[in-house]
């Protein structure tokens, strides 16, 4: 932590949603929520106050069309946030939710077991990898 920084940042890594807030010490505005840019559906980007704690494992043919619309570079092959939740509602066997809960499970921390009911052709990932995606 830098004591000379004009900002303080708070991060809530929730089981259902994550959020970021900040305060500028030299301004009277108080704390503010930082909007998080994310894909909210196919070809649709938006900035929202929370990032749903969902990870979607796209089909190979979906991957470039989904991740190619992001305004930032990513080496990640998974989609997180609202778009992950929306696409996962359509294809639930490719959706990971509540990964934070698996962090305390003996097998779930580092073993690649998620998504639990994934098709055989889908590479599974660990709860730690989901939490850092």
Describe each PLM feature range.
Residues 32-133:
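Phosphate-binding loop and its immediate beta->loop->alpha context
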Residues 2-30:
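Gly/Thr-rich phosphate-binding beta-strand-loop-beta motif of the actin/hexokinase/Hsp70
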């Amino acid at each position: 932590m830098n004591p000379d920084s004009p900002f303080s940042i708070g991060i809530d890594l929730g089981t259902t949603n994550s959020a970021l807030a900040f305060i500028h010490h030299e301004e009277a505005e108080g704390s503010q929520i930082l909007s998080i840019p994310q894909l909210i559906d196919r070809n649709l980007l938006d900035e929202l106050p929370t990032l749903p704690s969902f990870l979607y494992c796209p089909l190979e043919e979906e991957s470039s069309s989904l991740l190619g619309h992001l305004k930032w570079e990513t080496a990640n092959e998974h989609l997180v946030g609202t778009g992950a939740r929306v696409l996962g509602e359509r294809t639930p066997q490719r959706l990971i939710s509540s990964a934070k809960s698996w962090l305390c499970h003996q097998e779930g921390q580092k073993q690649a077991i998620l998504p639990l009911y994934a098709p055989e052709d889908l590479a599974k990932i660990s709860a730690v990898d989901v939490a850092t995606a």
